[in-house]
Regions:
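N-terminal leader/linker segments that precede catalytic domains of diphosphate-processing enzymes
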Residues: 1-298
Length: 298
């Protein structure tokens, strides 16, 4: 079984679920879109050692209406109810996405007083202050809103596109209700992983990620696999953003079954409701199987 999964004993009460946001930061290459991924430190209690997209739990401050007054682009995101029924919570998820992306990758979706994306590659007082603030945020001691206000920066969520919605299965010890977003990475911002929670970071195409996974060089978990599979269908960042702007985003709550083999059933699988997987026998399925330590489609 994958070493990054952490299941509770059979029959245990499901743990509480926390809202979370994750961002697939994208850039164009001749070989198609690349996404920035980080390798979570193996000592982390959740998905330790796995290659994931930058993200994390929503904080109370993310949902503060006063904070939202200083943010641009909520109207450009579209119907906030697609993200969450509570508008304040939907905005909080978008704010968490921006904050966590900055903490874990150094990519900042914010504009200066002139309306340009912040230039973090230019050495100077601004980049120095932001990098220091990022380090404080990563250590859970900083204030993201105050960091932005100090230099007159304005968070801009207009480029975020709601991409996927996953809830951690009930069998896992830690559970999150996670919204995944796409965003084009601004130029003049070199992504770098956070050394507090991750041990490496890289730009990678979906094809290369799957190749490294099959070679057992990296660990991937099912939501990441599904997002990479979908991202691989787009030829460019613009295609990905346009193709997801208004697309329906179903909520996916997988069911994990542990027996002679580990099976994950997704909504739409013929055995999802019963929770008792049978051999496909020619039927179309929507599931993953764990074989020899790797996830496979049947």
């Amino acid at each position: 079984m994958s070493s990054v999964l952490d299941f509770a004993p059979q029959g245990s009460a499901p743990p509480p679920v926390r809202d979370a946001a994750t961002v697939l930061a994208l850039r164009d290459t001749p070989g198609g879109p690349e996404v920035f991924m980080v390798r979570r430190d193996s000592r982390m209690g959740f998905l330790g050692g796995a290659h994931v997209f930058p993200g994390g739990a929503v904080d109370a401050k993310d949902c503060d209406g006063a904070l939202h007054e200083g943010v641009s682009g909520f109207e450009a995101v579209g119907d906030l109810a697609r993200i969450h029924a509570d508008p304040a919570r939907a905005k909080g998820l978008l704010m968490a996405a921006v904050r966590e992306l900055f903490e874990e990758s150094g990519i900042l979706l914010a504009r200066d007083a002139g309306g340009a994306w912040v230039d973090l590659d230019q050495e100077g007082p601004l980049s120095a202050r932001l990098n220091a603030g990022r380090a404080e945020l990563s250590a859970r001691g900083g204030d993201f809103a105050a960091l932005m206000a100090a230099d007159g920066l304005r968070v801009d969520v207009a480029g975020l596109r709601f991409f996927a919605h996953w809830i951690t299965p009930e069998r896992e010890k830690k559970r999150f209700d996670t919204r995944f977003f796409l965003a084009r990475a601004p130029e003049r911002q070199s992504a770098r992983h956070c050394e507090v929670e991750s041990s490496a970071g890289e730009w990678i195409t979906p094809g290369r990620a799957f190749g490294r996974y099959r070679a057992r060089e990296i660990e991937l978990v099912p939501p990441t696999i599904a997002c990479l599979e979908r991202l691989a269908t787009f030829a460019s960042v613009e295609d990905a953003l346009a193709g997801t702007a208004l697309a329906a985003v179903p909520c996916i709550l997988p069911k994990i079954l542990i027996g002679d083999e580990v099976v994950i059933l997704y909504p739409g699988d013929p055995d999802y409701e019963s929770g008792e997987p049978r051999p496909p026998a020619g039927r179309p399925t929507n599931r993953l199987l764990m074989r020899d330590g790797l996830w496979h489609r049947p």
